[in-house]
């Protein structure tokens, strides 16, 4: 009886010790030793059954997530066809009405793109391809995508020397820059609007700054702009916003080993800076 008690005490002490040092508690059944007394053997069997059931449930929900993502990607692919057809019709029948329709089609296209990147963002490691990219090429692609809005809102673009090579994924970076420039367009004001784009070369990083002279962001909102679904005062005042653009930018930057910072002053403008590390993780340094 005394021997059984000692075995039981040692067994539970070992379990408590493992739990205290185990970061992922659910792995307990995988690391606990086999018991050498009756009650311990029963507990071992229960733990193994619980572990097996947990793994089956995790696999079930992982498969569901994969199915959902594949459905979203198929849906995005299919919906791009009517969007492209509509834009072609608009291109061949330009007038005041079709120009307004084109503007709304661009919004729809942007929302569709957000859906695609959101579905991929949870598993971005399997989607991106790191290679050398020229920032000038990526930025000019984004400018071309938005040229109608620049003309319509009479926004001037000042692209300084941004002919820098960085290592990242071109499609992700283009999406991020498009979200930032899209915000500059959306929150422009009635005065002479300007978007200035430039780079700063640091010892261990390249900084790409996108600066506008729009309405700016109120101080109470500036620390929340990267929150999922946060629209803030500007989102309520100017247009219906999803609150997903900057959230996705920050999430993707983090997964790509980059940094994104935002500075703003009401009625003076906003500057968003992307920090591309040249080696390892970049350190945030003042832009000025």
Language model features by range: what are they?
Residues 268-270:
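Glycine-rich GHKL/ HATPase_c ATP-binding element in histidine kinases
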Residues 217-230:
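Short conserved segment of the HATPase_c
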Residues 184-185:
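Short helix-loop "hinge" at the ATP-lid/N-box region of the Bergerat-fold HATPase_c
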Residues 194-204:
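Short beta-strand/loop element within the Bergerat-fold HATPase_c
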Residues 212:
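Acidic ATP/Mg2+-coordinating residue in the GHKL
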Residues 147-159:
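Short conserved segments within the C-terminal catalytic ATPase subdomain
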